[in-house]
Each structure stands twice: as C-alpha cells, then as structure tokens.
Curated annotation (Swiss-Prot):
This is Cell division protein FtsZ. Transmembrane segments: none annotated. It comes from Pseudomonas putida (strain ATCC 47054 / DSM 6125 / CFBP 8728 / NCIMB 11950 / KT2440). It comes from the Bacteria. The gene is ftsZ. The lineage of its organism: Bacteria, Pseudomonadati, Pseudomonadota, Gammaproteobacteria, Pseudomonadales. Signal peptide: none annotated.
Length: 398
C-alpha cells in the first residue's frame, strides 16, 4: 500500500523588526499598507511608545536597565538593553528565513540595539537586511557622528544595508511638505522593498526566482539598493525599470559594478518578449561583468496595462582601482627643483693659461703653435711604412 508524503517545502518566513521610535513608525506604516506574507515585530526601550504600535509582536527591551523609560538618546544604554534581552530577541526570530531591520540612526535605542539584533539574526543563519535613515544636518554634528558609528557597527552584522538620508526629503519634497508626509515617503522605500521581496519569494512565476536566489544575491554583499517602479503605456517596461533604479531618496551610491542583481517583473498576460528584453538591457548597463543576475517574471491575470518592476542591487560602492602614480615626496627647495628640471650645460675643461708665453709676440706664438700641430700630425713610422710600398704603386697613389 502506498503512502503519500508531503514533501512540499513551507513558504519562507519573512519578518520586519522596527527598532526604536523611528523603526516603530515604519512598522506602523507597513501594517497600514497591508503587506501580505510578512510578520511585524516592534522593539523599543520606551514602554509608552509601544502602546500605540500595531505590530503583532511587541518586544520591550532592557526593563532592568531603563525601567521602561527609554534610552535617553544614549546608544550605549540601547546596546545594554538589547544585550539584556538577547535570548528574547532570539525567541521572536525563531524559524525566520529573512529579516528586515529598520530604525532611525542617531538616537539611543535604534542606534545601540539594532546592531545587537542583527548580530543575533546572523548567528541564527537568518538572511539579514537593514534599512536605516540618517539624521537631518540641522540635528547637529554629534547626532550625525552617533548615527555614522551606529551604521558602521550595523554593517558588520547584516548581509545588505540600505541607507536613506533624511536630507533627501527636503531636496525631493521641498520645505513646504508636511512632516507626516515626508517621513511617510521614507517609509515607502522600506515598504516597497519588503513588498517586492515578498512578491519575489512567495508568488510563483513563469520564470521563477525563489528564496535561494534572493540569498545568493543579498548574502554578504554590503551596500545595497532596492527600488520598485510601475508604469503603463507603450514604454512601460523601460519607464518602470528606470523608476526602480533611480530612487531619489536612497543614499548616493554608484550603481556601476553591482555584484548582485535581482529583478522581478510583474505584469498581465500581455507581457511581451520585447518588454522582457528592454528590462534586461537596462539592468545590464550598470551590472559588472561578473555580477550574479537573476530576472524573474510573474504573470498576474488581474493586471491590465500596468507593469511592475522590483530591482535589488547589492555589492555596491566597490572602489575602482586606478593606475598608481609614483610621487617623489623628498623635500626640495625652489632652487633645487628648478635645477632638477633645467640642467645646466656641461662645461668643457679649458687648458691652463701660460702667462710667460703671453710675453712673446703674437706672430711668434702662432708660428710655434702651428709648428707643434704639424709635428704632432707627422709620424716617422708613417714615412717608413710609405717607403715599403713599391715606387710604381706610390706614383699611382700620388
């Protein structure tokens, strides 16, 4: 008798954990966006801030350290709070395949706790991606320095890192934009990235891209960029792809030489081969010759005219080796530098002057010099050799 065994693997588990006040706001935004197939967690040291969070899982950090009153903008307090609840962090991440960590850098809880959470996730073998924001310049140099140090520590434990400078919000939206709409725009970057990755992994496609492909492209890659684009009309493929790779809110990174690229195209049954080719051509333009490129397609029967493109580019910011120019750093004076570039002509040795000879008349001196020169030219041996030649030959030579 045969027994049916279900060997179909379970769908990969994706979680988003917002750390601190900024991370909690981002999680709230995504919960309202109704992103399917993703679990949300919010971690904070401030008990009051956790009361208004719509996440399914709430994780209060460091009650013994902070007494539920927050980290007081001190990253070290945030770090100690995360270390205190390290085991609880591991519990909420149990069974996770991929985790997004989001926070606003420069404060206490997010800056200090996010690197610890990333460290725990990496130790558990979870594909870890961080999406963080940098402070506004007017928030002060001290806060910016704290943020930079936090990003540096976070980068050591995550597979891929996406940075959004708040300053870009002013540039793109203008000073008249409301504060709520500005931060919602930044949260849209994270929401778009999470939704795009979720669609790539969980929605089967005609040309399928699975979680193993995502891990290959995003694992241990460092600086990353994620973008989504949507367009309709005759040039929808090109317009959607260009919108996905030109997100104005992301940190200024050079897309040239990306080492890993993941692309997902979602469209209706009218997706053409030419459109598929257009997307690939644009992607090829900024990929390095040795890049790992994965392009998948999902055909959605409910879509009409619209085409969605999700692009994940990783391994960005690699330095291009330039020819090495050898420079002599030896200190030189201005006179030495001039003499080195303008060498003086070689002076020939002049014979010593015989002042006694100058007492003789010029005519006699010239005759003496002429006689000496003629005598120097005459060689007695030459005359003897000349006589050895037979006379008839000497006459012919003369």
């Amino acid at each position: 008798m045969f027994e049916l065994v279900d060997n179909v693997p379970q769908s990969p588990v994706i979680k988003v954990i917002g750390v601190g006040g900024g991370g909690g706001n981002a999680v709230n935004h995504m919960v309202k966006s109704s992103i399917e197939g993703v679990e949300f967690i919010c971690a904070n040291t401030d008990a009051q801030a956790l009361k208004n969070i719509g996440a399914r899982t709430i994780l209060q950090l460091g009650t013994g350290v902070t007494k539920g009153l927050g980290a007081g903008a001190n990253p070290e307090v945030g770090r100690q709070a995360a270390l205190e609840d390290r085991e609880r962090i591991a519990e909420v991440l149990q069974g996770t395949n991929m985790v997004f960590i989001t926070t606003g850098m420069g404060g206490g809880t997010g800056t200090g706790a996010a690197p610890i959470i990333a460290e725990v996730a990496k130790e558990m073998g979870i594909l870890t991606v961080a999406v963080v924001t940098r402070p506004f310049p007017f928030e002060g140099r001290k806060r910016m320095q704290i943020a930079d140090e936090g990003i540096r520590m976070l980068a050591e434990s995550v597979d891929s890192l996406i940075t959004i400078p708040n300053e870009k919000l002013l540039t793109i939206l203008g000073k008249d934009a409301s504060l709520l709409s500005a931060f919602a725009k930044a949260d849209d970057v994270l929401a778009g990235a999470v939704r795009g990755i979720s669609d790539i992994i969980k929605r089967p496609g005609m040309i399928n891209v699975d979680f193993a492909d995502v891990r290959t492209v995003m694992g241990e890659m460092g600086m990353a960029m994620m973008g989504t684009g949507c367009a309709s009309g005759p040039n929808r493929a090109r317009e959607a792809t260009e919108a996905a790779i030109r997100n104005p809110l992301l940190e200024d990174v050079n897309l040239q030489g990306a080492r890993g690229i993941l692309v997902n195209i979602t469209a209706g049954p009218d997706l053409s081969l030419g459109e598929y080719s257009d997307v690939g051509s644009i992607i090829e333009a900024f990929a390095s010759d040795h890049a790992m490129v994965k392009v998948g397609t999902v055909i959605d029967p409910d879509m009409r005219d619209e085409l969605h493109v999700t692009v994940v580019a990783t391994g960005l910011g690699a330095r291009i080796e330039k020819p090495v120019k050898v420079v002599d750093n030896t200190l030189q004076t201005a006179q030495q530098a001039y003499e080195a570039s303008n060498p003086a002509p070689v002076r020939q040795e002049q014979p010593a002057v015989n002042y006694r000879d100058l007492e003789r008349p010029t005519v006699m001196r010239n005759q003496a010099h002429a006689g000496a020169a003629a005598a120097a030219k005459l060689n007695p041996q030459d005359d003897l050799d000349y006589l050895d030649i037979p006379a008839f030959l000497r006459r012919q030579a003369d």
